[in-house]
Amino acid sequence: MGRAYSTIAFDPAKCDGCGDCMTACAQAKTGTDDIARSRIQIYGREGAADKTFELALCRQCADPKCVTVCPAGALNKDGTSGVIGWDATKCVDCLLCTVGCAYAGIALDEATGHVAKCDTCDGNPACVPACPHGALKHITTANIYNEVGDWEDLFAPGLAGCQGCNTELLMRHTLRRVGPDTVLATPPGCVPGMGSVGFNGTTGTKVPVFHPLLTNTAAMLAGIKRQYKRVGRDVQALAIAGDGGASDVGFQSLSGRAERGEQMLFMVVDNEGYMNTGMQRSSCTPYGAWTSTTPVGETSRGKTQDAKNLPLIMVNHRCAYVATASTAYMEDLYDKLDKAIAASKNGFAYLHVYSPCTTAWRFPSNLNMEVARKAVETNFVMLWEYTPQDGLHFTKPVDDPLPVTDYLKAMGRFRHLTPEQVEHIQKKVVENQKFVERMTEHAHVG
């Protein structure tokens, strides 16, 4: 399998042209405050109605044209880091590389008489933390791909999920990480609906899998785990259930096994409704959302109740580990998977993953990650973790959240909202944030 590389991402919507990134780069690379010598440059966009900015920075291209046009072989792409390096001993200062780069990422440093370009500061770019607005991010998710990309995909190819299904992405990543020595429970919902328990007489997974009722997933898995222990088999007990099968009809089973501290990892794929059976509302469906059972018309404007906060309910069970996660933040998700797996060896671990549904939420499948990311950036979804020993703390705190409308407008299920409904949702987001923040102030919730 090929190799992926870390990169520096730029969000022009957050850039105000302050130049702090250029100053930081100049200081790190030249020991001066001369931004003309910075290897990152921010330029105002000419003729724009609003003041917007563009980035001139080496993109460390997969097929770098600067390397191709260099007649002296002074530029080469490092196969480990992905960074295009410059060898001063070979450079003839012809500047052809500056012409070959489409991103203005390599330029002449007049003070030295040689070209200069970004080398990502050996993996710790000085420009990123210097940006006060978060317009620059060092994306290191490639590390996950490089680590697990060659691990076996334990779900069969060609599952019957909707185009761009976030749940399928989550299923494949989870099983890769948990590994083959696993017994899997998937109650009725999108996960078995797309093939985890089989289709045409063939199972969709490469691990033992069973299909419990909506009402008894955790109880049945606990019994199976205990039987494996009786015969001396240390297997990973894993449930992947939807929010309906966990927060509604399956809650008594979930709550009972959590209270007993059964040794399992229970993962909830929260797409905020019963999506497999026709997009009906669940108790995790947010206020105002359209579903087939909370329609929009003359007398109805979507769901009239706020969503149940199931993760916080599980915190009050004093589980060995509780966390929220999102596929938009894969490093955070993998870190929590590791902790949940470890905690499940001695107790009950609960992982609640927010999973946008392209079909029911009514947005294009190519915007899946953007919708998931906006949920976190607006604090509509908060990412945190809890253990009885360390209490609750944020793993991706958002101190300056975007307005909730930035999230709501991305989906058709909220397009009918009145200003009063939007105000209610924004107020609830702020209330939820303050509530969780109060919980983080106490070292031990239990």
From Swiss-Prot:
Gene Ontology biological-process entries: L-phenylalanine metabolic process
Expression induction or repression: Induced anaerobically by phenylalanine, phenylacetate or phenylglyoxylate.
Cofactor: [4Fe-4S] cluster
Domain of life: Bacteria
Family annotation (NCBIfam families): PhenlGlyoxDHPadI (NF045766)
Function statement: Involved in the anaerobic metabolism of phenylalanine and phenylacetate. Catalyzes the oxidative decarboxylation of phenylglyoxylate to benzoyl-CoA and CO(2). It can also react slowly with 2-oxo-3-methylbutanoate and use different electron acceptors such as benzyl viologen, methyl viologen, FAD or FMN, but NAD seems to be the physiological electron acceptor. Also catalyzes an isotope exchange between CO(2) and the carboxyl group which proves partial or complete reversibility of the oxidative decarboxylation reaction.
Designated name of the protein: NADH-dependent phenylglyoxylate dehydrogenase subunit beta
Organism expressing this protein natively: Aromatoleum evansii (Azoarcus evansii)
Upper lineage: Bacteria, Pseudomonadati, Pseudomonadota, Betaproteobacteria, Rhodocyclales
